[in-house]
Amino acid sequence: MYKRQVTADYFHKKTKDLIVSGIKASTVVGNSFSPVNAGNITNKGFELELGWQDRIGDFAYGVRANVATLKNKVTKMHESLSSIDGATYVTYGAITRFEVGKPAWYFYGYDFMGVDSKTGEPIFRDIDGVEGITDNDKTEIGKGIADYTYGITLNAAWKGFDFILFGTGSQGNDVFCGLNRVDYNLNQLTYFTKNRWTESNRNGKTPASGATDYTKYLTSSGCVFDGSYFKIKQIQLGYSFPKQLIKKVAIENLRIYGSLEDFFTFTDYPGFDPEVTGVGNSLGVDKGSYPNSKKVVLGLSVTF
């Protein structure tokens, strides 16, 4: 006997009067930024879930999959503000921004166009048309919010054996990689060094280590990567001993199992883990936080 399930939902949520730090207070109180009801956000999208359970003799199996889309947009801000800077990267300035018409806390920086093959200097898009690259040339360079997320679960059982595979993923989100600080010599990614411009590698994709505008590169699209991924969160295989066997030793249920957790990740992101932990105005910002650990789990479940 099979069982199937289909669930579909549409959501359109409007959030009003978000509280953020945005207005600079008087110098009398330290000239810090005071909290303010800065604006409104809309989130809308679809959620779809499909499920299938069936049995063929002693073999039972099931498949469950889900996908959710999300479109996020800032629709209104406090009248005294045109935008609000968010997460910062060391002393190089803000890398996220809150602004009407954009996704909440989108990545904000210079548009990196490549490396000058003669000098190793980074090249940026000149947006304001004025000679020289300044803060006025910063623009939207990515977003930490995924276009859609998805998951899949496979399960099966046969004569005491049971198996489950669970995976999740996201698509359309970016990650700002903050692991290439020139003032810090730990945990840097090989991507930046292997692709760096040198006299013997004039086609390098990242600027020379002594480039004049290197700090601008660190807040540019050159440090923004596709954060899409699919991760197998768990693979578990177990075996439950026959009751007629274990009841002889006064055991009601006995199950042994082994699992691999967070063991397999499929992504083009060069950092430690595309599933970064940044939240709020740091969504999608990777500053080197500890990645999810790969785990091998062996277990025994006993019921007397």
What spans do the regions from the language model cover?
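Conserved small-residue
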Residues: 20, 53-144, 268
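Hydrophobic, lipid-facing positions within transmembrane beta-strands of outer-membrane proteins
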Residues: 44-50, 148-154, 161, 232-237, ...
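Transmembrane beta-strands of outer-membrane beta-barrel pores
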Residues: 10-16, 52-54, 67-73, 158-160, ...
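C-terminal beta-signal and terminal closure region of outer-membrane beta-barrel proteins
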Residues: 35-43, 87-119, 194-196, 217, ...
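Outer-membrane beta-barrel and related beta-rich outer-membrane complex signature
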Residues: 7, 18-22, 62, 69-87, ...
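Membrane-embedded beta-strand positions of outer-membrane beta-barrel proteins
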Residues: 8, 50, 63-65, 165, ...
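Extracytoplasmic gating/loop element in the C-terminal half of outer-membrane beta-barrel translocons
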Residues: 170-261
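Conserved small/polar residues in nucleotide/adenosyl-binding loops
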Residues: 1-2
